[in-house]
């Protein structure tokens, strides 16, 4: 159906312009993806306790459209929280590779971001970004649940921005 706006009454035209949304398919997909994130939890230390708090009734991450999944094949966001050891690194990479595209990674806490207090240990990876590409870093030791929700919202903004501009904002 084609609408000729010149033939419409001014009130009808104003009503149509107010109620019709014009966008591209890429922007619509970006909006849908950003509002239905399914994170996979990968809790390795203290930050995992704070991550569990996000799913509790006080913070309730579900109301933002994010539902925790236990399988990498059902999730599109990996939240790595805690110290990643060199022995654990291949497992983190394998889980990342099992996730369907598009996929994103959040590094939660000082240990996942840069090795934390164990950075000088021979067995600790100095940041999960040496194993998988990280999209959002959440600092803190441990960061509180509100910081994780803020990080997830930043990831949503990033997804919508990439869909709108077509530019990648990651180190992939």
Curated annotation (Swiss-Prot):
Position of the signal peptide: none
Entry-linked InterPro entries: NADH_UbQ_OxRdtase-like_20kDa, NADH_UQ_OxRdtase_20Kd_su
Reaction catalyzed: a quinone + NADH + 5 H(+)(in) = a quinol + NAD(+) + 4 H(+)(out)
Statement: the UniProt record of this protein carries the keyword Metal-binding: yes
Keyword Lipid metabolism carried by entry: no
Gene Ontology cellular-component terms listed: plasma membrane; respiratory chain complex I
Superkingdom of this protein's organism: Bacteria
Record-listed [4Fe-4S] cluster binding positions: 46-47, 111, 141
Annotated GO biological process: aerobic respiration; electron transport coupled proton transport
A family per Pfam: Oxidored_q6
Membrane topology: Peripheral membrane protein
Cell location: Cell membrane
Cofactor binding, note field: Binds 1 [4Fe-4S] cluster.
Alphabetical keyword list: 4Fe-4S, Cell membrane, Iron, Iron-sulfur, Membrane, Metal-binding, NAD, Quinone, Translocase, Transport
GO molecular function: 4 iron, 4 sulfur cluster binding; iron ion binding; NADH dehydrogenase (ubiquinone) activity; NADH:ubiquinone reductase (non-electrogenic) activity; quinone binding
Main localization category: membrane
EC numbers for this chain: 7.1.1.-
Cofactor: [4Fe-4S] cluster
Known partners and oligomeric status: NDH-1 is composed of 14 different subunits. Subunits NuoB, C, D, E, F, and G constitute the peripheral sector of the complex.
Function in brief: NDH-1 shuttles electrons from NADH, via FMN and iron-sulfur (Fe-S) centers, to quinones in the respiratory chain. The immediate electron acceptor for the enzyme in this species is believed to be a menaquinone. Couples the redox reaction to proton translocation (for every two electrons transferred, four hydrogen ions are translocated across the cytoplasmic membrane), and thus conserves the redox energy in a proton gradient.
Family: Belongs to the complex I 20 kDa subunit family.
The protein's name: NADH-quinone oxidoreductase subunit B
């Amino acid at each position: 159906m084609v609408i000729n706006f010149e033939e419409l009454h001014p009130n009808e035209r104003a009503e149509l312009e107010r109620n019709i949304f014009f966008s591209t398919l890429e922007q619509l997909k970006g909006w849908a993806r950003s509002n239905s994130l399914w994170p996979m939890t990968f809790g390795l230390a203290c930050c995992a306790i704070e991550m569990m708090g996000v799913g509790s009734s006080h913070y309730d991450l579900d109301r933002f459209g994010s539902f925790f999944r236990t399988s990498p094949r059902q999730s599109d966001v990996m939240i790595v929280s805690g110290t990643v050891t060199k022995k654990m690194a291949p497992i983190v990479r394998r889980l990342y590779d099992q996730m369907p595209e598009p996929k994103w990674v959040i590094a939660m806490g000082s240990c996942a971001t840069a090795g934390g207090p164990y950075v000088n240990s021979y067995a600790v990876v100095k940041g999960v970004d040496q194993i998988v590409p990280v999209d959002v870093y959440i600092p803190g030791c441990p960061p509180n649940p509100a910081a994780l929700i803020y990080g997830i919202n930043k990831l949503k903004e990033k997804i919508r921005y990439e869909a709108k501009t077509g530019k990648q904002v990651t180190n992939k």
